[in-house]
């Protein structure tokens, strides 16, 4: 994509009321703009990142046999009244009425809808186990939205729901989703720490939160340092991970902690996912059942959430420097930034145009503007593409281009042929 034809409204200065790094860089790099308190528009560059994260999530979910659906944003209030949760959400849930004066809600989550869906469509126990997921916008009227897309009122979420015939099968589904989440986060360049958590208004009696370590995090985590190696091991052992000590601040007790204090790490963390075993909380109140051997039984359920739009902010929090964002390759809006330092030089112009054509517009953001070299380099660092391809003085004098890695700042000099052979296929 040619920068001259693209829309990236960058900011030179940080707005006065913005302090968190992810909020600063998501505004300055033109990913988002605020429309109202806690509500943001996603601009072209930010939407590309959002879609790339969504694609990683969908690939891992689909690979594990989990089926995608799409459920409505607007839900009948009667379903929430039936489940008993209508009053639990209080002012966080946006309540509306349609033209016929029927009470509706703008869904903050979808347990009621999916339970209703299964109780009216499940025809046989042979359809179990079943896990359905969606990627859908949600709205929760946060009292104090802050930190930009890290804690906003409207957000994109991947939520999944499992249905099983008994407890053992439900725990198998829970463990499968646990593993899928680790695989998703690792592909995004993150190391997730799973901690046992309170189920809150979602319900159930087993729950884990997934956090990434970040100094800006709101949570305080205590964990056995061995868990990092377990998470990053190619052979993910869920039982070992679940049995390794981790705890949020409210559940940690140094006096009763089962492992030596010397092996405990304390860090700040950002929550990026949450999984729950719900048991029959919803199936019992909403009569979601199946029949086997002429016996009617309640469905065992689980639910699993990842804040997709929140992940954009979380990734920036752990992947940036003083100059801007450092996107992991898997989700970067473009793999390459192509900069022609001598745009008036015919040779540099021709080489840049040739590289742009061969790389393809989906892989490269080509700075074809007439801006100064300093502005181009500063913008390149701010936007954070993994690789910076620089056409300049070395190109003219030696026929070589400079390829600089954004994360390490290390540069390589090579011919255009070497570059295309080494990088285009990767």
Swiss-Prot record:
EC number(s) per entry: 6.1.1.15
Name of the protein: Proline--tRNA ligase
Similarity-based family: Belongs to the class-II aminoacyl-tRNA synthetase family. ProS type 2 subfamily.
Primary site of residence: cytoplasm
Subunit-structure text: Homodimer.
EC primary class: ligase
NCBIfam families from the UniProt entry: PRK12325.1, proS_fam_II
CDD domains hit by this protein: ProRS_anticodon_short, ProRS_core_prok
Native organism: Ehrlichia ruminantium (strain Welgevonden)
Pfam families membership: HGTP_anticodon (PF03129), tRNA-synt_2b (PF00587)
PROSITE patterns the UniProt entry points to: AA_TRNA_LIGASE_II (PS50862)
Alphabetized UniProt keyword annotations: Aminoacyl-tRNA synthetase, ATP-binding, Cytoplasm, Ligase, Nucleotide-binding, Protein biosynthesis
Catalytic reaction(s) noted: tRNA(Pro) + L-proline + ATP = L-prolyl-tRNA(Pro) + AMP + diphosphate
MF terms in GO: ATP binding; proline-tRNA ligase activity
Gene Ontology, cellular component aspect: cytosol
